[in-house]
Amino acid sequence: IAQCLVGSEMCIRDSFYTAMYHLLIHPNIIQDVNGEYPMMESLKVGHTTGNRYTVFSLWDTYRNVSTLMTLLYPEKQLDIIRTMIDMYKESGWLPKWELYGRETLTMEGDPSIPYIVDAYMRGLRDYDIETAYEGMRKGATTPGEFNLLRPDNNDYMSKGYVPLREQYDNSVSHALEYYIADWNLSLLADALGKKEDAKLFRERAMGYKHYYCKEFGTLRPILPDGTFYSPFDPKQGENFEPSPGFHEGNAWNYTFYVPHDIKGLAKLMGGQKRFVDKLQMVFDKGYYDMANEPDIAYPYLFSYFKGEAWRTQKLVRELLGKYYHNAPNGLPGNDDTGTMSTWAIFSMMGFYPACPGDLDYVVTSPTFNKVTIRLDEKFYPKGELVIESARKTPEDIYIKEVTAGGKKLKGYTISQDELVNAGTLRFTLENKH
């Protein structure tokens, strides 16, 4: 927990360190003192000389926990990724939601891909990436009837989307997870020199456009014959009621979950203004669900557009104040093995990874006047990152200027390399936007 030293604002500080504690609960070590552990999907006993981990809630953690572990605890992150690759070697599949050596198949998607790729793209590479890629490609290309991770892969590969075949089959949610996984897989394929694969998976990742319905301005389930599902209510699914096409949410919770192509989604919606107005409406009308992973990065999407970053800064501060407290109800819901807490950690420090695999963070106004991050010099030679905020009053929540290592940022993003080599990240804040 002492990797980050924050300011003296007592209540906020306690919430921050509580979130850090939550981050580190899972995954947890499973091997015994002699190195023995239960092998994946087997009655056999394996042996390790390192650390073997368990409890992989990957549908949640690929969104932000992977990035934070790579930044703060790279050595542990390496052991976690090596464990995931060993699980593939033992069972034939990368994990989706592993629990003590068993695959629960909870939630959807192919989340090991973005979890590992994000770490790889950020420079963490001391593991067998070719075997990892083999496992990723298997999940992405195996026909559905033989595919543990993507049971509806036949439709996805042939049509570019997953049609709704049963009333509550979560088809749109499945496809959206495949799109972000395939986009990440295209990044890795490109990095490994597998150009044809990179092209294939990059094209697949754009399939979300099939679901966009101009009539409602949201994503909408598609039937096997290619027509949109009817009758359709984009609000159906509120409060976890069943919803055709969507898992634990509704169309508004999922429509903006195309983190790898936000500008493309905005173009579908009719341009920047319509995108921003629609996204703002999600917050104004209470459609946003802080406890639902697919939309937790929504506040940061405004910053992709010129002149709109103030909305990010305002909303993030409001959400932190509303949902995170040093009290029994101090979380927006199930912490999902650190995912909700990680949102708070990043947001309090002043930067957030809005898209897994993308090396840029979106910046926002930090909660603290000073944060010191102790970076592992084995991985980040600079050794320390100090985040400072210059403000006159607590109402100064809007960014006037950000400098990294004395150099002014041109926009509202900072790359991984800029961040870890900055030494000092300094925010000048004001009370107007």
List the model feature ranges, each with a label.
Residues 1-7, 12:
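Single conserved hydrophobic/aromatic residue that forms the stacking wall/gate
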Residues 13-61, 65, 72-143:
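N-terminal core-entry segment
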Residues 22, 26, 119, 301, ...:
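Structured loops at beta-to-helix junctions and adjacent beta-edge loops in soluble globular domains
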Residues 35, 91-93, 217, 226, ...:
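Detector for glycine-centered tight turns/loop "hinges" at secondary-structure junctions
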Residues 48-63, 71-73, 113, 123-381, ...:
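Active-site core of glycosidic bond-cleaving carbohydrate-active enzymes
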Residues 391-433:
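C-terminal beta-sandwich/jelly-roll accessory domains of carbohydrate-active enzymes
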